[in-house]
């Protein structure tokens, strides 16, 4: 049962003004029409607090009487929770349950919710141990919790089902103050990750000498928590490596290892493992890691990788690629715009993305600034030219594809270049007549336009003249009928 001070949510005091203010503050929450029971409890607490404020000696006497009248089992339970050596020991809790079993069923029924209330108030409680008592007393099955807040009780029982975030027995070798600090820190961190994910980054950034218990369950949770907010922790890399050693086929182990290496700032040494993971386990998570690495270390590949990821997602039920032109989705264009305005691209990479945003006709690809580049030795030039033609739904020259394919088969291609080249070779289907087709020149095209425009203009004039004659003839006939 809650005391009057707990209901009013203030500390014990003899100042009547503080009691009255607390009562008025709680009154709107317990209106007599909407919550008559809550209002009754609040009113009784207010009157009791006023009485104790007038006679504080009576409160001390009441506390002594309550302590003396408290059931033996309740006192034993408080002793267990305060014990530095037994509070986290399942065997000690089993011993307490055996002591509880010596009482008759009527007494146990009366003790069910008082024991639950004491457990809820405990600051440093092992939920794994509390689950033993919850199972014995059927806290999950009964709803007749006398005098307890229902929401508070449900939240506590839900926490018991989730269990401790790590094995508290791993703390027994440390001083009691460090035990309490560690339990409190990880309990708050887990609640923050579960109910307030927007504040996890700020929580993890808090400075302090935090102990990391030797518990594999906690270590994997830390991997998940840190990776979810894209934060690196060097101490977690060996944890992920050990996980992968124990479970070589685990997709999660490989993901968290790549993620932590990336967020800890690893560069080229990570790329081979990251590409292997991306190819072995296609997923949105793998796509995001690859794009993040490219954005940090090789931004000129970023736009090409976005096309690769979009193309890979466009497959039929049998896993065969669809006839789909990359660059049409809103997400792709948003990512292109993001890297374009990041200031990280080379002039060649910037001109490539700009050409994609302003698509030309397939025959006029020479107008693109990518096509006019003179950096023949650039490893990106062939990639950009072929990729642009894929977006424009045109046929690239075979010699460009041949150079890319030679680099790929010879093992000279950068890992990201290899990924992009394979996508382009899949998307492009050359026709035999395309091999010897040269790029059109602007002069030739303009001449063709001039030659084609002349007969088209004469035909239009003839059509208009005939139309006027027909209309005039029809109007004349109509006029003759009415004359």
Curated annotation (Swiss-Prot):
GO terms for cellular component: plasma membrane. Keywords: Chaperone. Residues 432-441 have a biased composition (Acidic residues). Residues 442-454 have a biased composition (Basic and acidic residues). GO terms for biological process: response to cadmium ion. Residues 431-456 are annotated as: Disordered. GO terms for molecular function: ATPase activator activity. Residues 3-70 form the J domain. This is Uncharacterized J domain-containing protein DjlC. It comes from Escherichia coli (strain K12). The gene is djlC.
């Amino acid at each position: 049962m809650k005391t009057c001070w707990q209901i009013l949510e203030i500390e014990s005091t003899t100042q009547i003004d503080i009691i009255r203010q607390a009562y008025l503050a709680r009154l709107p929450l317990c209106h007599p029409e909407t919550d008559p029971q809550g209002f009754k409890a609040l009113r009784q607490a207010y009157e009791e607090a006023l009485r104790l404020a007038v006679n504080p000696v009576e409160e001390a006497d009441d506390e002594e009487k309550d302590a003396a009248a408290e059931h033996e089992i309740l006192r034993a339970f408080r002793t267990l929770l305060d014990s530095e050596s037994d509070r986290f020991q399942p065997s000690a809790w089993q011993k307490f349950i055996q002591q509880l079993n010596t009482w008759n069923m009527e007494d146990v029924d009366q003790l069910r919710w008082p024991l639950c209330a004491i457990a809820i108030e405990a600051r440093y409680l092992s939920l794994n141990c509390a689950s033993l008592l919850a199972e014995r007393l059927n806290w999950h099955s009964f709803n007749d919790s006398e005098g307890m807040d229902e929401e508070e009780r449900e939240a506590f029982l839900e926490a018991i089902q989730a269990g401790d975030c790590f094995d508290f027995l791993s703390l027994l070798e440390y001083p009691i103050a460090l035990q309490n600090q560690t339990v409190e820190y990880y309990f708050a961190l887990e609640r923050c990750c579960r109910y307030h994910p927007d504040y996890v980054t700020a929580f993890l950034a808090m400075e302090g000498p935090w102990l990391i218990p030797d518990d594999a369950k906690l270590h994997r949770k830390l991997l998940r928590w840190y990776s979810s907010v894209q934060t690196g922790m060097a101490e977690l890399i060996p944890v992920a490596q050990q996980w992968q050693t124990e479970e070589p086929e685990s997709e999660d182990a490989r993901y968290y290892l790549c993620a932590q290496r990336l967020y800890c700032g690893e560069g080229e040494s990570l790329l081979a493992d990251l590409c292997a993971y991306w190819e072995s386990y296609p997923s949105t998570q793998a796509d995001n890691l690859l794009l993040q690495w490219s954005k940090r270390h090789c931004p000129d590949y970023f736009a090409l990788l976005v096309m690769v990821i979009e193309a890979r997602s466009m497959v039929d039920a049998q896993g065969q690629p669809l006839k789909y032109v990359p660059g049409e989705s809103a997400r792709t264009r948003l990512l292109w715009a993001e890297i374009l305005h990041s200031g990280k691209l080379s002039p060649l990479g910037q001109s490539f993305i700009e050409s994609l945003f302003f698509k030309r006709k397939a025959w006029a690809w020479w107008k693109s600034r990518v096509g006019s580049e003179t950096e023949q030795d650039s490893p990106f030039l062939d990639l950009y030219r072929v990729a642009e033609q894929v977006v424009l739904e045109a046929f690239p020259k075979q010699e460009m594809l041949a150079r890319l394919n030679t680099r790929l088969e010879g093992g000279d291609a950068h890992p990201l270049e290899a990924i992009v080249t394979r996508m382009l070779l899949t998307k492009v289907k050359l026709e035999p007549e395309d091999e010897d087709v040269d790029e059109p020149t602007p002069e030739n095209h303009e001449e063709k336009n001039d030659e084609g425009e002349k007969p088209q203009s004469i035909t239009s004039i003839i059509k208009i003249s005939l139309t006027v004659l027909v209309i005039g003839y029809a109007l004349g006939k109509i006029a003759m009928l009415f004359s």
